[in-house]
Amino acid sequence: MDSLLLYFADEQAPALRLAEALGLPAAAIERHRFPDDELRLRLPFGAGQAIPRQVLLYRSLDRPNDKLVELLLVAGEARALGVQRLLLVAPYLAYMRQDIAFNPGEVVSQTIVGAFIAQHFEGLVTVDPHLHRIERLQQAVPLGEAAIALSGAPM
């Protein structure tokens, strides 16, 4: 298998529509929350099963805090298993509003989250990101032309 789309159960319907449109197989990531709110994730690769060279991870980043940890864990395990190319499909991209420090000590989350994504993924596709004082998504997520912002406006 060359490419696979991975998704979480709460986003199954849109992820499967995307997989069908792209002609890709899709599989769910198992997610368990422990009483202390830690997460246990399991990628859908069985013992002896071929690992795809490329994985598209579908994860919208609304209510982002747990989901950013999920990205970190999934990307780390996918790399450990031998996945060579990780692409993030995030219809909503969180933490893009805070693009400047208005007061001393304020965290510029856009820069930090953008660097985090670029560190773990070779590409990003999102829709209408909050880019207030910058012109292009690539300024926030340093992936060059592999950081793609689509418009949700009707054509």
What is each residue range found by the language model?
Residues 1-155:
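PRPP-associated nucleotide enzymes
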